[in-house]
């Protein structure tokens, strides 16, 4: 991957999109996993090199099952992108232990065009995933540590309108 202007200043959304395109073009996100981690009798992890035939057979089986392998990205590449800030994306060297819960963020269909026009451009319905300091997805706690390291209270329910 060649160095671009992203290394030198503030990242815009366009530069982040081009960064992701560069990763895809470089083949980092391909479905090939050349090594497999195996456990020995004493519990230690070892890295086992697969043959090309084994890797292809496993890739075709994983594709049928809908499995997408996690691909490692160079840590230096992530350090260069630390300035990118998004409530939905967190570039990290560590992968979470579980996938995030899926939330539907689409608004209900409203027949009144006037209220829809007032609401356009205002997005107050974002649902943010809250991670604790152990990089696990939290769904059942009343307090947690957010992605900036601050202690936050997790609300069980949010009441809107007059009570």
From Swiss-Prot:
A Gene Ontology annotation in the biological process aspect, one of them, is: nerve growth factor signaling pathway
Residue span of the signal peptide, if any?
Answer: 1-3
Q: Which GO terms describe its cellular component?
A: axon; dendrite; extracellular space; synaptic vesicle
Q: Which SUPFAM superfamilies match?
A: Cystine-knot cytokines
Q: Which residues form the propeptide?
A: 4-119
- Glycosylated position list: 112
Question: Which Pfam families does this UniProt record tie to the protein?
Answer: NGF, NTF3_N
GO MF entries = growth factor activity; nerve growth factor receptor binding
Domain of life according to the entry: Eukaryota
Primary localization: secreted
Localization in the cell: Secreted
Keyword Transport in annotation: no
* Family, per entry: Belongs to the NGF-beta family.
Its biological purpose is as follows: Seems to promote the survival of visceral and proprioceptive sensory neurons.
Q: What is this protein called in UniProt? A: Neurotrophin-3
């Amino acid at each position: 991957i060649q160095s671009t202007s992203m290394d030198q200043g503030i990242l815009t959304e366009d530069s982040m999109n081009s960064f992701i395109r560069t990763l895809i073009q470089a083949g980092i996100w391909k479905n090939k996993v050349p090594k497999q981690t195996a456990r020995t009798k004493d519990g230690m992890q070892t890295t086992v090199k697969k043959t090309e035939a084994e890797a292809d057979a496993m890739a075709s089986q994983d594709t049928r099952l809908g499995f997408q392998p996690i691909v490692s990205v160079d840590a230096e590449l992530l350090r260069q992108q630390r300035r990118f800030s998004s409530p939905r994306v967190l570039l990290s060297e560590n992968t979470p232990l579980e996938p995030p819960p899926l939330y539907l963020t689409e608004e209900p269909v409203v027949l009144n065009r006037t209220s829809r026009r007032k609401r356009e451009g205002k997005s107050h319905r974002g649902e943010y995933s809250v991670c604790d300091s152990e990089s696990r997805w939290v769904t059942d706690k009343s307090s947690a540590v957010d992605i900036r390291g601050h202690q936050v209270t997790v609300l069980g329910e949010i009441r809107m309108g007059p009570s």
